[in-house]
UniProtKB/Swiss-Prot annotation:
Pfam family, one: Radical_SAM
Annotated function: Catalyzes the conversion of dethiobiotin (DTB) to biotin by the insertion of a sulfur atom into dethiobiotin via a radical-based mechanism.
Enzymatic reactions: (4R,5S)-dethiobiotin + (sulfur carrier)-SH + 2 reduced [2Fe-2S]-[ferredoxin] + 2 S-adenosyl-L-methionine = (sulfur carrier)-H + biotin + 2 5'-deoxyadenosine + 2 L-methionine + 2 oxidized [2Fe-2S]-[ferredoxin]
Name this polypeptide is given: Biotin synthase
Keywords: 2Fe-2S, 4Fe-4S, Biotin biosynthesis, Iron, Iron-sulfur, Metal-binding, S-adenosyl-L-methionine, Transferase
Species in which this protein is naturally found: Burkholderia thailandensis (strain ATCC 700388 / DSM 13276 / CCUG 48851 / CIP 106301 / E264)
NCBIfam families: bioB
Pathway entry: Cofactor biosynthesis; biotin biosynthesis; biotin from 7,8-diaminononanoate: step 2/2
Cofactor(s) the record lists: [4Fe-4S] cluster; [2Fe-2S] cluster
Enzyme Commission code: 2.8.1.6
């Protein structure tokens, strides 16, 4: 044998080449800047490849612990840093949450989301929340919770309870984030999302537009979401509700066509995700909501209140879907 043949094999691991992002911010901006009809046509084509274009999932959101949050998110009425007149409340009893879930199901919802205004839950909170999750799932409803930042063992505990989705929004682009929040870093959010993913829970992650950000910064948010590996299974898009007493109470209202564009861009860049119309629907008239469905939104939050802000009344939503010939279903992906 030659010296080369008898030499010990190397133990060094080859360094992998950096993976290029699927979507550069410039690419997302290019989508935003397409003529409106072209953008919606492309989004609708993408939507039909993966979903029934006339199916909408109805989700109901319940605030299970309201107010007193330690974070200083500039848009939020529940922050203890802002004087919005909202009184802090304790975590709801399990039976009360399950009663609300039953009502939501009776009203046509197939997804029930539970939100708590915490920076992060204490371990003592996890057990009653697990009971809520199990009880809601026993009703045949899809479950989602949003509790703030999670530790690894907390994410695993929620997964053991059968949680379907954990919501933890990025809110905006990394570049604009510091103008909205100072008490939690962008990386804090990404770390929680990684723990959720590692625990085997589906990720629900989106953001809020209309906070004074530029189109480039909106594109930065979409690129950040779309470049996650994998991208979120659920992407809620919120239209800012300017709440008196918050730093963003005087924010200029977003052009509704820009909101529709954002829905379309989210659909194109994350084709298999549930794209959800979330807070701020009250600011969109029926025609604009119809355009959002055309752009690829296939879920909406349903009921009179989202956490602490108003929402179109359930009866109005049912009438709108009927006028459009759309049906309230689970809007599951088409089979391959």
């Amino acid at each position: 044998m030659t010296e080369a043949q008898t030499a010990c094999p190397t133990t060094e691991t080859p360094v992998a080449a950096p993976v290029a992002p699927r979507w550069r911010v410039a690419d997302v901006i290019a989508l935003y800047e397409l003529p409106f009809n072209d953008l919606l046509f492309r989004a609708q084509q993408t939507h039909r490849e993966h979903f029934d274009a006339n199916a909408i999932q109805l989700s109901t959101l319940l605030s299970i612990k309201t107010g007193g949050c330690e974070e200083d998110c500039g848009y939020c009425s529940q922050s203890a840093h802002h004087d919005t007149g909202l009184k802090a409340e304790k975590l709801m009893e399990v039976d009360a949450v399950l009663a609300a879930a039953r009502t939501a199901k009776e009203n046509g919802a197939t997804r029930f989301c539970m939100g708590a205004a915490w920076r992060n839950p204490k371990d003592r909170h996890i057990e009653p929340i697990k009971e809520m999750i199990r009880g809601v799932k026993d009703m045949g409803l899809e479950t989602c919770v949003t509790l703030g930042m999670l530790e690894e063992h907390q994410a695993k505990a929620l997964a053991e309870a059968g949680l379907d989705y954990y919501n933890h929004n990025l809110d905006t682009s990394p570049e604009f984030y510091g103008q909205i929040i100072s008490t939690r870093t962008y990386q804090d959010r990404l770390d929680t999302l990684e723990r959720v993913r590692d625990a085997g829970i589906n990720v629900c992650c989106g953001g809020i537009i209309g906070m004074g950000e530029s189109r480039r910064e909106r594109a930065g948010l979409i690129a950040q979401l779309a470049n996650m590996n994998p991208y979120p299974e659920s992407v809620p898009i919120n239209n800012l509700v300017a709440i008196e007493g918050t730093p963003l109470e005087n924010a200029q209202a977003l052009d509704p066509f820009e909101f529709v564009r954002t829905i379309a861009v989210a659909r194109i860049t994350m084709p298999k995700a549930m794209v959800r119309l979330s807070a701020g629907r009250e600011q969109l008239d029926d025609s604009m909501q119809a355009l959002c469905f055309l752009a690829g939104a296939n879920s909406m939050f349903y009921g009179d209140v989202l956490l602490t802000t108003g929402n179109p009344r359930a009866e109005a939503d049912r009438k709108l879907l009927a006028r459009l010939g759309m049906s309230a279903t689970e809007a599951t992906q088409l089979s391959a």
